[in-house]
Amino acid sequence: MSRFFTTGSDSESESSLSGEELVTKPVSGNYGKQPLLLSEDEEDTKRVVRSAKDKRFEELTNLIRTIRNAMKIRDVTKCLEEFELLGKAYGKAKSIVDKEGVPRFYVRILADLEDYLNELWEDKEGKKKMNKNNAKALSTLRQKIRKYNRDFESHITNYKQNPEQSADEDAEKNEEDSEGSSDEDEDDDGVSGTAFLKKKPDSSGESRKFHKKMEDDDEDSEDSEDEEWDTSSTSSDSDSEEEEGKQTVLASKFLKKAPTTEEDKKAAEKKREDKAKKKHDRKSKRMDEEEEDNEGGEWERVRGGVPLVKEKPKMFAKGTEITHAVVIKKLNEILQVRGKKGTDRATQIELLQLLVQIASENNLGVGVIVKIKFNIIASLYDYNPNLATYMKPEMWQMCLDCINELMDTLVAHSNIFVGENILEESENLHNFDQPLRVRGCILTLVERMDEEFTKIMQNTDPHSQEYVEHLKDEAQVCAIIERVQRYLEEKGTTEEICQIYLRRILHTYYKFDYKAHQRQLTPPEGSSKSEQDQAENEGEDSAVLMERLCKYIYAKDRTDRIRTCAILCHIYHHALHSRWYQARDLMLMSHLQDNIQHADPPVQILYNRTMVQLGICAFRQGLTKDAHNALLDIQSSGRAKELLGQGLLLRSLQERNQEQEKVERRRQVPFHLHINLELLECVYLVSAMLLEIPYMAAHESDARRRMISKQFHHQLRVGERQPLLGPPESMREHVVAASKAMKMGDWKTCHSFIINEKMNGKVWDLFPEADKVRTMLVRKIQEESLRTYLFTYSSVYDSISMETLSDMFELDLPTVHSIISKMIINEELMASLDQPTQTVVMHRTEPTAQQNLALQLAEKLGSLVENNERVFDHKQGTYGGYFRDQKDGYRKNEGYMRRGGYRQQQSQTAY
């Protein structure tokens, strides 16, 4: 017996020494008994040795199979290890690849692996769940595959452009190789490498093609079983066994019987023709089926195992008498599994709805129905266990409908009393002779509904149509709150009424009442009778409503939080409707600014929003100083967006962990409540400009002048640093350019920078009364430019006519007279008014520019001398021997003892 049957061929022994191929698993049994299985004719057959191409390609395909298995289980570490081995194996097969070309299956795995890694990289949630090794391997492998694929860029591009064609070519090549290997000596290469790679299903109709491929494989296997042992099917059978990952005995793998007679050759040729014909028939049949499927429409993905007809769950056994006790018992059974792990919340809601239907069909009374509906609404709220997750649209609509149905029932049956203080043991659900008592709190349901609505608005893209659709639901929310308010006014306690009033206030305070505003602009005499009747039918104005609700809370509330929120909302509403003095007085009388730092964050956000609205209201009234003071704290911090609850800053995100960030995001106000930050900053900067520019001109020579607004000075310094100044584009650049013009007393240029088309679109048109605001701004710019002009050029004039000033700044003469008189009274301008000639006579008491410089130099020299003397005393051992209150101590030769600064007392001689 030849040693070949036990040791294998020479080429195989060499490849096994290299350690690069997979080690074959020995089959149970002794190799020595293997020849007994062979016939006498097969002992003389020609031994066929596998080529180097087959061995190299088999090694590549085995590694590819391992990589794909690792991809399925998301084992990136294994993918990295096998990819490195794959690169080494490809390098050893380089000589074969240079002759044959890059195999398609190799290009496919490179493209698929790169796409797979990109998907993992983009999946942020999946990356967080990865362990440390997989995350590190993902980063490393992604870099390696991107670098490695540069050499195969053209091949990968061709494959991605037509992946189906490449897959068909592989299949055809596989068939040709498997058929060619059955001949006697026609092809020495034997099996093609593509035979070891599974065909990748197409993106469309995956399941259909997969089943058809399995049917083809079954038919091929049946054909091979019908063939005799002495035909060329040995090679194809071994190929199929290798594709299935089964290692066979080397002796049986490489044995092959060669046809010896012409009859055998003809029989083999005939069988090959029959096999090719069968394959052609199957292929044509498959194409016909695909055409029929395509005519029927696209394939639809369905969930396996889900029945098409979903049966309703059975609540009670057949023949069970439906009574109050049975229904309550079933309700308790459903509620017992509530919140447990593995509970289907949607099914629980369906069971409760079915229970309501059963109770109504059996006329069990409204008491049972009300109790079940309370639990349905509570189950809807508990559908999402995560606090940050908001309700789905269908669940939200179901919740609104359930609350409306519950309110209809409670309003229609006045004998039903609900409350949290009612114990379950003392409930009365079926005794209609007495008032029905049900445990539950309608106020809690409405508050939770309001919170869910806020959560929906927080998690919806504010610039999408979906946000607008959700915002339309606020009308239903407000209607439900109003119904509950009327219900609680009749049957609720004082605390409950205060809470529902606050909910009504929170949905009213930020809305501008345009109808009431129009009625204020139009006098009653000018409106027709129909318009007056329509105004009466519309109900009370928002101002009257806010006054009534807030006053009740002021008088009845016992908690500081509800009263504080009501006061802030009332102030906000006053400021929004330009009632400055009412808003200011209410803020000052409440003393909220003294202890607001002790309030919880949502109340602090409401306080900040109220102060901002108060400042904007003062600006609209022309009170620039009050506006600046109200906005100073918010704008000077540089965190206006965060303080107003309109977003989180990137720099602050690094200071808090993930849980704190989630809590902060839940505190954000919805987008429709936002205050325009650009408008806010513009109001602040313009107010600062109107205050700061005249002050800078009046104290130009004062080295110790204070800054009114640091942010405004910062913007001025930024503008001065620009090497090339073009026309202003942003809002800040417009304000800086206007400030420079106001410094020169050029009010027209300042006006053109503040009020133009660009600034109107960004800021001024956003005000309810935009024309009034623009008129006020022009007036303020003229007045402050006049003050700046007098401060800057007072040293130039001996006297100046007020008529000239009136013409220069287009102000009427009484206004100019009033401004100059105030400046003289406040000792800002050293001048006097000559009434007969209507002129301003300058007194020249202020130093000139040269004198100011000399005074500054003298002051600096004096401070330098004092510092030098103090240093000298310190070196001589004097400790604090010179004090600021001891003026001219050295100049008058008053002695100082060198003992800690104790002044020597001169002895007085008595005469």
From Swiss-Prot:
Family indicated by similarity: Belongs to the eIF-3 subunit C family.
HAMAP family reported for this sequence: eIF3c
Record's comment on post-translational modification: Phosphorylated. Phosphorylation is enhanced upon serum stimulation.
Cellular component per GO, a single term: eukaryotic translation initiation factor 3 complex
Record's function text: Component of the eukaryotic translation initiation factor 3 (eIF-3) complex, which is required for several steps in the initiation of protein synthesis. The eIF-3 complex associates with the 40S ribosome and facilitates the recruitment of eIF-1, eIF-1A, eIF-2:GTP:methionyl-tRNAi and eIF-5 to form the 43S pre-initiation complex (43S PIC). The eIF-3 complex stimulates mRNA recruitment to the 43S PIC and scanning of the mRNA for AUG recognition.
Residue spans of biased composition, Acidic residues class: 166-190, 216-230
Keywords assigned by UniProt, alphabetized: Acetylation, Cytoplasm, Initiation factor, Phosphoprotein, Protein biosynthesis
Annotated positions of the Phosphoserine modification: S9, S11, S13, S15, S16, S18, S39, S166, S178, S181, S182, S907
Organism (species): Rattus norvegicus
GO biological process, one term: positive regulation of translation
The protein's name in its UniProt record: Eukaryotic translation initiation factor 3 subunit C
Compositionally biased intervals (Basic and acidic residues): 199-208, 259-276, 884-897
GO molecular function: ribosome binding; RNA binding; translation initiation factor activity; translation initiation factor binding
